[in-house]
Curated annotation (Swiss-Prot):
NCBIfam families: PRK00290.1, prok_dnaK
Protein name: Chaperone protein DnaK
Keyword Zinc annotated: no
InterPro entries (alphabetical): ATPase_NBD (IPR043129), Chaperone_DnaK (IPR012725), Heat_shock_70_CS (IPR018181), HSP70_peptide-bd_sf (IPR029047), Hsp_70_fam (IPR013126)
Stored PANTHER family: HEAT SHOCK PROTEIN 70KDA (PTHR19375)
Residue numbers of Phosphothreonine PTMs: 181
SUPFAM superfamilies: Actin-like ATPase domain, Heat shock protein 70kD (HSP70), peptide-binding domain
Length: 593
């Protein structure tokens, strides 16, 4: 039977863009945001005490220094981002910023579905460690979501693809290159069971790095004519370069060269600096060759780990917008010869769809599906000599529980420290420390005699619990490994209250921001009309009407009179409609987007 405790939405919380999906009966539906788009920029802006998310925040990137991008790269760390809003400095955790994105996705999903939503499945890169997974769950909690499951992005993609393939048995390789992370997973799909055979990846590699290579090239080209110019210290210039680089990367996926035009990118004592550069696909691929090569070994690693020959791979799924780059597709095809990547899936949406499918499984709406994922990295404890002794090895199917017996290193030792590490290096210090706890009350005895049982338990979310038990006395202690920047419960609850308290105000601010951009766009449109040759045919009365609208919009914007601004915007729309009827029903000037 279906569990009717509300919908469970599927969320792909991406570095660059995020996406939300839901199962409506047997249909997998990607939910559009208020801008009518199926993905939302993972951008958060802070202005006058308000929080702006998505497209509206992205439009402020050039003008608002309190705009945060790629926050996913900081998840699971103790790093914070600083903003200065209205002269007040504030430090924000990655969880808090991510929660604003999740809250925005949740809110528009509620409006589109007409239902209250409090449950979600959220995806993470397969190579996210324990702290990063915990941080994602915390972000969900701050956003008012019960995170029912954390699943790996490549696994979600395979789930979205394979659910409609019936009982066909196949091995599917998922190559997932997102904005900030990279994963490769190999799955065996048969009779509704999705088993991850192996996974590999790089949490510090993504489309942002390709953008940065273009930025470096642009700066170097400009420096040829302006050697003393320091663009890197100019935040606004760097943001323009970032936008130009991202646009060039996208265009070079479809064409052999692109023009990068940056008028007034800087001002020197000699005057303004204008840059107009042509970047070819060949040059772009040369600049980014080292990045592409970093994705080669993980493919080989998963095939080797799973003991699968490339010829045995039945399907290749390319996930993440960066996989649209031709060089990426060529590399994958060279690694898996005679098997073209599947191009029927949308690389930007498939992960969120897979998360929604998993939500359907948890609700009981989707039947006969079993998902068997793996832990991406070895989990170990530090033993005598600083050695990392594995308890659960990488690519072990989860959920899983494993135990080993250890003892004391010194005579009459009455307590032991259990230090937990994650990684593949032989020495503990070379891996990532996840946490430490102590077990006391051990009866004095010669070294090596007490028996201490260490148990590692990983749940379906990939989150680790470690228990130490003295088998002689029965005493035990345990720790749930959590984010190294863990927020205490009081702080989490404060953030939840803040988000709820500001909900109405944030909605008003967002509406005003959208009106501001609409008004500014109309002013630009009218100025273009009045400055065009066609304006000569306009009667003086019409020109006067347009000039009056421009003055009215500019005045309302300057005074922040929102009702007056709405009247002026409506006035332009009426003028446009009247003109359309007057001149025979032809197309009116387009309203700016």
């Amino acid at each position: 039977m279906s569990n009717n405790n509300g919908l469970i939405i599927g969320i792909d919380l991406g570095t660059t863009n995020s996406c939300v999906s839901v199962m409506e009966g047997a249909q997998k539906v990607v939910i559009e945001n208020p801008e009518g788009k199926r993905t939302t920029p993972s951008v958060v802006s802070y202005k006058n005490g308000e929080i702006i998310v998505g497209d509206a925040a992205k439009r402020q990137m050039l003008t608002n220094p309190n705009t945060i991008v790629s926050i996913k790269r900081l998840m699971g760390t103790s790093k914070k981002v600083k903003i200065n809003d209205k002269g007040v400095e504030k430090e924000l955790t990655p969880e808090e910023v991510s929660a604003s994105i999740l809250s925005y996705l949740k809110d528009y999903a509620e409006k589109k579905t007409g239902q209250k939503i409090s449950r979600a499945v959220i995806t993470v890169p397969a190579y996210f460690n324990d702290a990063e997974r915990q941080a994602t769950k915390t972000a969900g909690k701050i956003a008012g979501l019960t995170v029912e499951r954390i699943i790996n992005e490549p696994t979600a993609a395979a789930l979205a693809y394979g659910i409609d393939k019936g009982h066909r048995e196949m091995k599917v390789l998922v190559y997932d290159l997102g904005g900030g992370t990279f994963d490769v997973s190999l799955l065996d799909i048969a009779d509704g069971t999705f088993e991850v055979m192996a996974t590999a990846g790089d949490n510090r590699l993504g489309g942002d790095d390709w953008d940065n290579k273009i930025i470096e090239w642009i700066i170097a080209e400009i420096k040829k004519d302006h050697p003393s110019l320091d663009l890197k210290s100019d935040k606004m210039a760097m943001q323009r370069l970032k936008e130009a680089a991202e646009r060039a990367k996208i265009e070079l996926s479809a064409q052999l060269e692109t023009l990068i035009s940056l008028p007034f990118i800087a001002v020197t004592p000699e005057g303004p600096v204008n840059a107009e550069l042509t970047l070819s696909r060949a040059k772009f691929e040369e600049l980014t060759k080292d990045l592409l090569e970093r994705t080669r070994n993980p493919i080989a690693d998963v095939l080797k780990e799973a003991k699968v020959d490339p010829s045995q791979v039945d399907e290749i799924l390319l996930v993440g917008g960066s996989t649209r780059m031709p060089a990426v597709q060529k590399l994958v095809e060279s690694m898996i010869p005679n098997k073209a990547p599947n191009r029927t899936i949308n690389p930007d949406e498939v992960v969120a769809i897979g998360a929604a499918v998993q939500g359907g499984v948890l609700r009981g709406d989707v039947k006969d599906i079993l998902l068997l994922d793996v832990t991406p990295l070895t989990l170990a404890i530090e033993t005598l000599g600083g050695v990392a002794t594995p308890i659960i090895k990488r690519n072990t199917t989860i959920p899983v529980s494993k135990s080993q017996i250890f003892s004391t290193a010194q005579d009459n030792q009455e307590s032991v420290d259990v230090s937990i590490y994650q990684g593949e290096r032989p020495m503990a210090r070379e891996n990532k420390s996840l946490g430490t706890f102590s077990l006391g009350g051990i009866q004095p005895a010669p070294k090596g005699k007490p028996q201490i049982e260490i148990t590692f338990n990983i749940d379906a979310n990939g989150i680790l619990n470690v228990k130490a038990k003295d088998l002689t006395t029965g005493k035990e202690n345990s720790i749930t490994i959590s984010n190294s920047s863990e927020l205490d419960e009081n702080e989490i609850q404060r953030m939840i209250r803040d988000a709820e308290a500001n909900k109405e105000r944030d909605a008003i601010v967002k509406q005003r921001i959208e009106m501001r951009y609409e008004g500014e766009g109309i002013v630009n449109t009218i100025n273009e009309i009045l400055g065009s040759k066609e304006a000569e045919a306009l009667p003086a009365q019409e020109k006067a009407s347009l000039t009056k609208i421009v003055d009215g919009i500019n005045g309302a914007l300057k005074a922040e009179k929102w009702d007056e601004l709405k009247e002026q915007i409506d006035g332009f729309k009426k003028w446009r409609d009247d003109m359309s009827k007057k001149y025979g029903g032809g197309e009116a000037p387009a309203e700016p987007k």
